[in-house]
C-alpha cells in the first residue's frame, strides 16, 4: 500500500495514495496506524482524497483506528472524501462517528 506520513506538531497526517481501500490492502493501513499510536502519537488525520472505493474491510480498519485513538484520548479524523466514499459513510451512518473535513488544511485548523 502506498502511504505517505507527515508529522505536523503532535499530529500525524497519513496520505493514502491508493484508489481502493479494501480487503486487499486495509491491513497495511491498520498496521501503520497501530505503529503510530504505539510510538505515542494520539492524533491521526487520514487524507483519503485519492481513494475512490472503500469496502467493509476498509471501513472496519477506520473504525478500529477510531477506537484505538479514543482509548488513548486522541482522535482519528478524515478528510478529502470523494463522493462514492462519502456515500458509503452516509449509508453506514459512520459520518456521524468521524470528524470529516474537505481538506487537510481545514482539518488541521480543527486541532
Outline where the language-model segments fall.
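Conserved catalytic submotifs in the C-terminal HATPase_c
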Residues: 8, 49, 105
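Short acidic-hydrophobic, aromatic-tinged amphipathic segments that line or gate anion-handling sites
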Residues: 99-103
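Amphipathic alpha-helical interaction surfaces in cytosolic regulatory modules
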Residues: 20-97
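Acidic phosphotransfer microenvironment of two-component signaling modules
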Residues: 83, 105-106
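Flexible glycine-/small-residue-rich
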Residues: 16-18
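Short beta-strand/loop segment at the start of cytosolic alpha/beta domains
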Residues: 1-14
Amino acid at each position: 500500500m502506498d502511504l505517505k506520513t507527515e508529522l505536523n506538531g503532535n499530529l500525524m497526517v497519513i496520505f493514502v495514495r491508493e484508489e481502493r481501500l479494501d480487503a486487499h490492502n486495509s491491513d497495511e493501513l491498520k498496521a501503520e496506524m497501530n505503529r503510530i499510536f504505539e510510538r505515542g502519537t494520539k492524533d491521526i488525520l487520514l487524507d483519503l482524497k485519492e481513494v475512490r472505493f472503500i469496502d467493509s474491510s476498509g471501513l472496519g480498519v477506520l473504525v478500529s483506528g477510531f477506537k484505538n485513538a479514543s482509548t488513548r484520548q486522541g482522535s482519528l479524523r478524515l478528510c478529502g472524501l470523494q463522493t462514492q466514499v462519502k456515500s458509503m459513510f452516509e449509508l453506514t451512518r459512520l459520518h456521524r462517528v468521524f470528524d470529516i473535513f474537505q481538506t487537510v488544511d481545514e482539518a488541521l485548523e480543527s486541532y
